[in-house]
Amino acid sequence: MEVYFSGTIERIIFENPSNFYRILLLEIDDTDAEDFDDFEIIVTGTMADVIEGEDYTFWGQIVQHSKYGEQLQISRYDRAKPTSKGLVKYFSSSHFKGIGLKTAQKIVDTYGENTIDEILQHPEKLEGITGLSAKNREAFVSTLRLNYGTEMVLSKLANYGIPNKLAFQIQDFYKEETLDVVENYPYQLVEDIKGLGFTIADQLAEELGIESQAPERFRAGLVHSLFQACMETGDTYVEARDLLEQTLTLLESSRPVELDPSQVAQELSYLIEEDKVQQIDTKIFDNSLFFAEEGIRSHLVRILEKGKQKSHDLETIQKHITTIEEELGIEYDNIQKQAICDAIQNKVFILTGGPGTGKTTVINGIIAVYALLEGLDFRKKSNLPILLAAPTGRAARRMNELTGLPSATIHRHLGMTGDDDTSHLEDYLDAEFIIVDEFSMVDTWLANQLFSNISSNSKILIVGDSDQLPSVSPGQVLADLLHIPLIPQTRLEKIYRQSKESTIVTLASQIRQGILPADFTQKKADRSYFKIASGHIPATIEKILGAALRNGIPARDIQVLAPMYRGTAGIDAINQLMQDLLNPPQKDQLSFEAPQCHYRKRDKVIHLVNDAEINVFNGDLGAITDLIPGKYTESKQDEIVIDFDGNEVSYPRNEWYKIRLAYAMSIHKSQGSEFPVVILPITSASRRMLERNLIYTAITRAKSKLILLGELQAFDYATQHIGTARKTYLIERFSDLLENVEEKQQAVSETVTSSASEQSYILTEENWDRIPAMIGITDTDLKEIFGK
């Protein structure tokens, strides 16, 4: 419930000028908060300059701080007219360089009432004040205009019901044009301000008198619904009928009014005519996705058709393959040899396959043959004109470990500073041969960015597993490219990387084919299954952790992967449990409170966005090495120091949204990584998330041990459930170069299924009841999991 506190600012405890975050001590004169009988309260939030000793009213929510007790977390505020005494104190503060008490008093005396307004309207009067240099005078007016102008804007936005945090985002984006945009083009905020959404902009528009039937309202609703639908489904377009239905639902839920669908359809036609959205038949595209798909097509065709291709005869390539086999003591099968030949002889080549099928072996063979053909020593990796890239930092480091060649993220190679960066290099990537791994994670936007920066004279090897989860953002680029005959490809099927006792790779292959094997519940050397109800999963994980640690397995080697964040078996709850078990609070040990947890030294954390400037990327895992209170930092904010494999990075409090605990993490975030021990809890509570590629991706993250927890029905459902195929238009864009494109949908959704003769091998519903529930897990059971 929102409450207000009016009173005098007794002290400014903390302030960060870079993001306007402040902590104040307010002496209370009045409040409507029930049962609050203290005479002062801590006030926190984003606000422009405030003056000690002056009167303000703050609105917000009372929250409980673990260390400092009750605080007011503000949503908006208002200040009373400042007093002369308060202004003198404010002008002589550290906010304004070169102004002492005497000069500040002269300024107030010169301008009299409404001092700040008068200064901003008539700054020339400052020239007559002795002791105030031209440089300090200019800086004084500039700072005052910034702070007071910001406050005026915030106050106005607050009157429109926009919370302070969003108001600062709006002010930061539009600068001096803020009020003009807000008051005249409120729906522009939907496109420009991340996190604002349509509803807030629509409420603002209603405040400003924009009618519910206004054309600009319909257009904003259409554009917003289109983009949101693509982000939620992963599709790159929406059918016009579906878009109109979704938009009508949005518009009518935002304001209680019944609308004429034909009017909304008319505005969709307007958006198409004005190139605000794109249309192909009945398909409606967001502009960025439409042109990104078209870009992928045009750049791949450019590379395939226009570049120079060095000619290497097949006999020479085969001779070099034999040389490498002899030197490295390996033997390629015929399919692997053909893959090496095809990758060398083609400008663009796709290599795909599941875990253990030899993708890395083939990649190393391609690199070595390419080096020999160029007259280079393939053992001297630093001399090779080859660029290795991957969508995540962990995947890039893994490429480096497996090939010995330098590797980096796609973002880093392209000089992209963040996920939203759409900048291009001044020149193409400097490499004759570019190898990109984990391509199933590459979305439509990033694929376009990558291909547009590759020279027509470069070769590209695309590597990935199309049966894994597709990219988080729209598109299924790898899956689509695999159905374009113009691009040569090889799928590796035979499993090599598996000892006699290893079963994880075999299980993954069976899951990929939609088979839950009859021995799924049986104890194996490298995997175990425990039938556990959702509510008992935390206690089971606690037992498993204890057993693992007693058997000498380092905590850092154990990773819990889960489908959802919420619930008793969700990521958030498991993270809290594992933090308390593996890194419990210590007496007199510093910890920092964040919205979802308390951070402690030695905590395992994950970075959630791409930050090329600090060389940390989405999915990177690190450990907290230090916690530094704000009074000791340059930013004046509490800072968390995290070590990412030797790269130490400091996170001030306003950047903590980029990290979270990672004892447990989402299956999506685990892509591109491998862990010695994976614990995978799957229950019906996460049914809406369960799909075959989700379980397959999770299982393939386990390197040595896989512990499956949960309900057998949930695992079976996930194995059988393919999920909804993403709707994309990438394959059709190659239609002028291909035949039989109309078979796309059948090709994309084609899956390998088991025959009726295999029924005895599959665990069926009839067999479920024959499996005893793991009501209690004994120490012997647990010891067997990790026994050596």
Region locations from a protein language model:
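Short basic/glycine-enriched coil/helix segment immediately N-terminal to the Walker B
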Residues: D419-E432, D443, N448-S458, S670
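Walker B catalytic acidic pair
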Residues: D437-E438, G464
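C-terminal accessory regions
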Residues: D626-K788
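ASCE P-loop NTPase motor cores of helicases and related translocases
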Residues: R255, Q278-I434, L482-R497, I504-K531, ...
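Accessory alpha-helical DNA-binding modules that contact the DNA backbone or grooves
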Residues: I23-L26, F36-V43, I51-W59, V63-D281
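Short aromatic-glycine-enriched beta-strand elements
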Residues: E15-E27, K631-V641
